[in-house]
């Protein structure tokens, strides 16, 4: 394979390896793009006050963003099997930049909801890169390279909270979304220069492509199992972050967006663990890694309830719930992609669609739980999601 400085001119072939510079670019852009979903989380209290809405309405901002991402997974990501990834990525980044500017300028929560929904749809680029890392890597490097790209993605998830917390506290929440639009334009220029040619793996019409996704879902029960199990684990993690700004705004913390953002650094443990987890999957198997992930999340919610008024308790909760979620995501996602090696984007679509439906439900349930029982309600909601995920593992044993 040509591994010179230019990667735009090469053509990737399955199982033949990915140039290191391209792999780094995929990880970096994955993180910067997926960050669009999470900038709003530390800023919810600031947005709520600025737009004069209640906590449930503010929580819906995160919810519709997650729903948009799920829709993008279902209708945009599969196109990577039949169209140019470079063109899909470019269109998505331009749209994401426009929606970020719209969010920064609006004074109506309804417009913010709509723009957040579309922003979620346009932020699915990482989910074209993760299966790409598996499909084109050398067989012995597939799990490792997937973990590398996921580490970049997860660093973006957690780094987004840190950056938005600081920018929101110092310059206001609207500034964060202007910055996000600039980041997307930079990613656009880089991706147009570096993304290589890749031959389509599907020949046919879009309707046939969508039907093939349904066929894969019907014919592969393990894909259904892995997807649903990971979805509940992700929902459990989203319960933490969807209400963190509200929890820290009250007694005894009285903290602003900067403090919420700083807690994002604690979740970096999950991002750092992702690459290592990928190495253990072939050795210990998907079920064992998932089991460990569920146990970590159960412990996390016990800590969250017992030490609700302690920063140390909150930090421990974030670390445990994030690492638990990454155990589930990487192991179950790897299992899904292994079921259909020639249709990785479509099987990844199924997996990630479930994941973000689970995340959306976790966000929604946590929002209503907060409105009813405050932090105790959030802990109960997160615990239920973790218990369901563990129950699936114990019953199915795969």
For each feature predicted by the language model, list its residue ranges.
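Juxtamembrane intracellular "pre-TM" segments in multi-pass secondary transporters
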Residues: 7-17, 195-228
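Helix-breaking motifs and short loop linkers at transmembrane-helix boundaries and internal kinks
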Residues: 52, 84, 105-110, 307-308
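Conserved MFS/SLC helix-loop-helix module at the cytosolic interface between two early adjacent transmembrane helices
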Residues: 71-107
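Helix-to-loop junctions at the C-terminal end of transmembrane segments
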Residues: 73-84, 273-286, 370
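Cytoplasmic helix-loop-helix junction between adjacent transmembrane helices
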Residues: 115-151
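Intracellular juxtamembrane helix-capping segments at the cytosolic ends
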Residues: 125-137, 327-340
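Helix-loop-helix hairpin linking two adjacent transmembrane segments in secondary transporters
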Residues: 148-195
